[in-house]
Protein backbone atom coordinates (compact mmCIF):
# COMPACT_ATOMS: atom_id res chain seq x y z
CA UNK A 1 0.00 0.00 0.00
CA UNK A 2 1.74 3.13 -1.26
CA UNK A 3 0.93 6.25 0.79
CA UNK A 4 2.00 9.79 -0.07
CA UNK A 5 3.85 11.93 2.48
CA UNK A 6 1.75 14.99 3.32
CA UNK A 7 4.42 16.72 5.40
CA UNK A 8 7.51 16.19 7.48
CA UNK A 9 7.09 16.78 11.21
CA UNK A 10 9.20 18.85 13.56
CA UNK A 11 12.16 17.61 15.54
CA UNK A 12 13.99 18.90 18.57
CA UNK A 13 17.73 19.20 18.96
CA UNK A 14 18.17 17.21 22.18
CA UNK A 15 15.34 14.65 22.20
CA UNK A 16 16.48 11.02 22.53
CA UNK A 17 14.14 9.84 19.75
CA UNK A 18 14.16 12.73 17.25
CA UNK A 19 16.99 15.00 18.43
CA UNK A 20 19.16 16.11 15.54
CA UNK A 21 22.05 17.09 17.84
CA UNK A 22 21.80 14.27 20.39
CA UNK A 23 24.96 12.19 19.90
CA UNK A 24 23.39 9.29 21.84
CA UNK A 25 19.98 9.68 20.19
CA UNK A 26 18.14 7.83 17.45
CA UNK A 27 17.77 10.76 14.97
CA UNK A 28 14.33 9.52 13.92
CA UNK A 29 12.50 11.49 11.21
CA UNK A 30 8.69 11.69 11.28
CA UNK A 31 6.25 12.06 8.38
CA UNK A 32 2.48 12.47 8.17
CA UNK A 33 0.91 10.26 5.49
CA UNK A 34 -2.19 10.88 3.41
CA UNK A 35 -4.31 8.37 5.37
CA UNK A 36 -3.49 9.95 8.75
CA UNK A 37 -0.71 7.53 9.65
CA UNK A 38 2.39 8.90 11.34
CA UNK A 39 5.44 7.19 9.85
CA UNK A 40 9.03 7.35 11.02
CA UNK A 41 12.36 6.42 9.50
CA UNK A 42 15.22 5.31 11.73
CA UNK A 43 18.42 3.31 11.55
CA UNK A 44 19.26 2.32 15.10
CA UNK A 45 22.99 2.13 15.90
CA UNK A 46 24.96 -0.58 17.69
CA UNK A 47 25.26 1.48 20.89
CA UNK A 48 21.49 0.95 21.35
CA UNK A 49 21.83 -2.84 21.46
CA UNK A 50 20.69 -5.33 24.04
CA UNK A 51 22.03 -8.66 22.81
CA UNK A 52 24.61 -8.51 20.02
CA UNK A 53 22.89 -7.63 16.75
CA UNK A 54 19.61 -6.71 18.49
CA UNK A 55 18.06 -3.36 19.40
CA UNK A 56 17.23 -2.97 23.10
CA UNK A 57 13.52 -3.43 23.88
CA UNK A 58 13.42 -0.10 25.69
CA UNK A 59 14.60 1.65 22.53
CA UNK A 60 11.88 -0.15 20.53
CA UNK A 61 9.33 0.96 23.14
CA UNK A 62 10.53 4.58 22.92
CA UNK A 63 10.19 4.53 19.11
CA UNK A 64 6.65 3.14 19.31
CA UNK A 65 5.65 5.54 22.10
CA UNK A 66 6.85 8.62 20.23
CA UNK A 67 5.34 7.56 16.89
CA UNK A 68 1.92 6.71 18.34
CA UNK A 69 1.97 9.87 20.46
CA UNK A 70 2.77 12.02 17.44
CA UNK A 71 -0.23 10.55 15.59
CA UNK A 72 -2.38 12.92 17.67
CA UNK A 73 -0.76 15.87 15.83
CA UNK A 74 -2.31 14.72 12.55
CA UNK A 75 -5.81 15.72 13.68
CA UNK A 76 -4.84 18.16 16.46
CA UNK A 77 -1.60 19.99 15.60
CA UNK A 78 -1.65 22.06 18.80
CA UNK A 79 -2.23 19.12 21.16
CA UNK A 80 0.61 17.05 22.60
CA UNK A 81 0.47 13.51 23.87
CA UNK A 82 1.70 12.54 27.34
CA UNK A 83 1.90 8.78 27.80
CA UNK A 84 -0.53 7.29 30.31
CA UNK A 85 -0.11 3.64 29.35
CA UNK A 86 1.95 1.73 26.77
CA UNK A 87 1.76 -1.99 26.02
CA UNK A 88 4.36 -3.47 23.66
CA UNK A 89 4.41 -6.91 22.07
CA UNK A 90 7.76 -8.07 20.72
CA UNK A 91 7.30 -10.47 17.79
CA UNK A 92 10.72 -10.67 16.12
CA UNK A 93 14.23 -9.47 16.92
CA UNK A 94 14.87 -5.91 15.77
CA UNK A 95 18.31 -5.57 14.15
CA UNK A 96 20.41 -2.43 14.28
CA UNK A 97 22.24 -0.80 11.35
CA UNK A 98 19.29 -1.41 8.98
CA UNK A 99 16.60 1.10 7.97
CA UNK A 100 13.37 0.59 9.91
CA UNK A 101 9.92 2.10 9.47
CA UNK A 102 7.79 2.81 12.53
CA UNK A 103 4.09 3.58 12.05
CA UNK A 104 1.44 4.90 14.41
CA UNK A 105 -2.15 6.05 14.26
CA UNK A 106 -4.91 7.25 16.54
CA UNK A 107 -7.73 4.83 17.33
CA UNK A 108 -9.97 6.82 19.70
CA UNK A 109 -9.94 10.50 20.48
CA UNK A 110 -11.98 12.47 22.99
CA UNK A 111 -11.62 15.75 24.84
CA UNK A 112 -8.81 14.72 27.24
CA UNK A 113 -7.48 11.36 26.04
CA UNK A 114 -6.65 9.51 22.90
CA UNK A 115 -5.48 5.98 22.18
CA UNK A 116 -3.43 4.64 19.33
CA UNK A 117 -1.53 1.73 17.91
CA UNK A 118 1.79 1.31 16.19
CA UNK A 119 4.32 -1.11 14.75
CA UNK A 120 8.00 -1.38 13.97
CA UNK A 121 8.40 -2.74 10.44
CA UNK A 122 11.46 -4.65 9.30
CA UNK A 123 12.91 -3.94 5.83
CA UNK A 124 10.84 -6.85 4.43
CA UNK A 125 7.62 -5.30 5.83
CA UNK A 126 7.15 -7.79 8.68
CA UNK A 127 6.05 -6.45 12.06
CA UNK A 128 8.84 -6.85 14.61
CA UNK A 129 6.98 -5.17 17.48
CA UNK A 130 3.51 -3.72 17.97
CA UNK A 131 2.09 -1.46 20.63
CA UNK A 132 -1.07 0.15 21.89
CA UNK A 133 -1.07 3.23 24.04
CA UNK A 134 -3.24 5.71 25.90
CA UNK A 135 -2.24 9.36 26.06
CA UNK A 136 -3.42 12.49 27.83
CA UNK A 137 -3.65 15.62 25.71
CA UNK A 138 -1.62 18.63 26.85
CA UNK A 139 -0.62 22.03 25.54
CA UNK A 140 3.06 22.21 24.64
CA UNK A 141 3.55 25.11 27.06
CA UNK A 142 2.41 22.82 29.91
CA UNK A 143 4.96 20.08 29.22
CA UNK A 144 8.04 21.73 27.68
CA UNK A 145 10.03 24.92 28.16
CA UNK A 146 11.69 25.57 24.83
CA UNK A 147 12.51 29.22 25.53
CA UNK A 148 14.64 28.87 28.67
CA UNK A 149 16.26 25.61 27.52
CA UNK A 150 17.50 27.06 24.23
CA UNK A 151 15.85 24.10 22.52
CA UNK A 152 14.05 24.53 19.21
CA UNK A 153 11.18 22.68 17.58
CA UNK A 154 11.33 22.84 13.81
CA UNK A 155 11.38 20.89 10.57
CA UNK A 156 14.85 19.87 9.43
CA UNK A 157 14.61 19.11 5.68
CA UNK A 158 16.76 16.30 4.37
CA UNK A 159 17.62 15.48 0.75
CA UNK A 160 16.61 11.88 1.42
CA UNK A 161 13.10 12.73 2.72
CA UNK A 162 10.71 10.29 1.01
CA UNK A 163 7.74 11.26 -1.14
CA UNK A 164 5.83 8.14 -0.11
CA UNK A 165 5.93 5.06 2.11
CA UNK A 166 5.11 1.58 0.89
CA UNK A 167 3.40 -0.04 3.89
CA UNK A 168 2.15 -3.61 4.18
CA UNK A 169 -1.55 -4.13 3.47
CA UNK A 170 -1.96 -5.26 7.09
CA UNK A 171 -1.51 -1.60 8.02
CA UNK A 172 -4.53 -0.48 5.94
CA UNK A 173 -6.88 1.79 7.87
CA UNK A 174 -9.58 -0.31 9.47
CA UNK A 175 -13.10 0.98 9.09
Residue ranges and their predicted role:
Residues 1-47, 151-175:
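Non-catalytic linker/capping segments at the edges of enzyme domains
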Residues 31, 53, 126:
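Residues that recognize and position ribonucleotide moieties
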Residues 24-26, 36-38, 80-86, 98-100, ...:
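A generic structural signal for short beta-strands and their flanking turns/coil linkers
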Amino acid sequence: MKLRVVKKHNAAKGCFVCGVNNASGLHTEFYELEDGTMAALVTVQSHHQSYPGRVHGGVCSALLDETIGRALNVSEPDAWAVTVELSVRFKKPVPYDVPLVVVGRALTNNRRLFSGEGAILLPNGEEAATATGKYMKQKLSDIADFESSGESWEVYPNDSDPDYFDLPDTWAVRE
